[in-house]
Each structure stands twice: as C-alpha cells, then as structure tokens.
Design a protein with these regions (language model features):
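Active-site neighborhoods and metal-handling regions in enzymes and metal-associated proteins
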Residues: 1-253
Length: 253
C-alpha cells in the first residue's frame, strides 16, 4: 500500500473521524448521514464529490482482468454441469430450494469457491417475475412443466466474482414466453456486439438492450447491467447500464 494509507480496525473509525480537521471529501451518493454529521461536529469543512477510490477500482488492471476470465471459465463449467443436471431431472420433482442447493453444490465442487456472490435468485413461473426474489420455506414453489425458471446466481473466487442469469424453459412454453425470451436474447446479443466511441455513458447504450422489446411494446422497469467487483461486491459502481447512469464507460470496466 501507499505510504499515505493506514489500515485500522473498524472499531477505531468513529474516533479517527472525530479527530479529523480541515477539508474532507464526502461522496453524497454513498456517505451515511451519520458520518457526515460526525465530520461537521468535528469542525471539518466538507468538500462534496465522487469518492476518488471508486473509479480506479472499477477499471480493472491486467491481473484483475486475467483473473476475471479464469473465474468465469471455472464458474461456467459449474453452471454447465448444473444445467445438464437440471435437464436430466424427471418432470415435476423439483422445488426452487432444490434447484438452489444443487447449483450451489456444483460451485462448491470446483474447490475454489469462497462464497456465493449473493443469495441465489431462483423463481419458477410467476415467482420469476418478482425482481430480486429470494425463495424461503414459505414461498418455495414447485417447478412445474411449462414454467419459465429464472436463475440469477454467482460465485466469489479469489481471482474474480461472477454474476450470471439464465432462464430455462421447463418443457413446452407458450408463444408469449418464447417471444419475450427471444427479444431479451436479441438485446443481450446486441449489447455483446456493440462498439461505441469513447465518452459514451451507460444510459447511451442501455437502449440497445431494450430496443427489441420496445418493438413489441414491452419493457422492464430495472437497469440492464452493472459493474462487478474483483473478489469484492457483486454490484460495483460507478458504471451501470441503465437509463439513469451518467458515468462514462472506460477501458477495464
């Protein structure tokens, strides 16, 4: 670490902040109001602006990029084994919790998993339409033939963090489901292939993913994508693909 960086126990933070003086940078998008008040009470002059640590962290270096690739290849192997397992299960024998436990087991079997990236989202049928749904013993639904099964999951590895969403048709589904799936896939392909000039923001590219749905009078109320940490938070800013994102997209993000 740089000579100007000091590491201290979290328990010492309040005392250290109370002892500060002079000008202190505060990021209004992430600083808790209690910390802001503490600094003001200490007599600090607050300078509001982006956290200077966030952007360098978001732009991965060559080691982090190589680690991310390795982590994704490892995680993809576990995901492929899981999907093969799911395809081989007899119809009408699984619940959402069964699916979650199986997927986490395949990631554990890599021998490199440190933790899951977040509580696995596994929604069968109507539960798949609930944004950030988390299955519980009370909400646990049987996976039925004809369901769309949405699975949003990821793994934390020393060399990288993953976050992958897949929607699986459990047997035959209707034309409306096929159309929605296809249009989302078209948006994903468009985003994967797009090349853009330097200086564009997440909001400038977000529409490429939505355009196939817009053609059918459809849309989704949440963002399209987000940054991912390197063995850190699975949601890492400041970059996002959403209507509201004003962050310029930079190499390494």
């Amino acid at each position: 670490l740089d000579a100007g960086i000091t590491i201290a126990a979290p328990a010492k933070m309040i005392g250290a902040l109370s002892a500060l003086s002079g000008v202190v940078r505060v990021d209004p998008t992430s600083c808790p109001s209690a910390i802001e008040s503490l600094l003001q009470d200490a007599g600090c002059s607050l300078s509001y602006g982006p956290d200077p640590c966030v952007l360098p962290k978001a732009c991965k270096n060559s080691v982090e990029i190589a680690g991310t690739i390795t982590a994704h290849l490892r995680d993809a192997g576990a995901m492929c084994e899981f999907l093969a397992w799911l395809d081989a299960q007899p119809a009408d024998t699984l619940s959402e919790i069964d699916v979650v436990r199986a997927l986490e087991g395949f990631r554990q079997a890599t021998g490199a998993l440190k933790d899951i990236s977040f509580d696995t989202i596994c929604g069968a049928g109507p539960n798949g339409a609930i944004i950030h749904y988390r299955v519980t013993e009370d909400s646990n639904r049987a996976v039925k033939p004809g369901d769309l099964l949405l699975i949003d999951s990821g793994g934390q590895y020393l060399d990288g963090t993953t976050d992958i969403t897949r929607t699986v048709a459990m047997g035959d589904v209707g034309n409306a489901e096929k159309s929605a799936f296809t249009r989302v896939l078209q948006g994903m392909i468009a985003m994967s292939r797009i090349r853009w000039p330097a200086g564009l923001r997440g909001r400038d590219l977000d529409l490429a993913a939505r355009q196939p749905l817009w053609m059918a009078g459809q849309d989704y109320p949440h963002g399209t994508g987000h940054g991912v940490g390197s063995f850190l938070s699975v949601h890492e800013g400041p970059q996002r693909l959403s209507r509201a994102s004003g962050q310029v997209l930079k190499p390494g993000m």
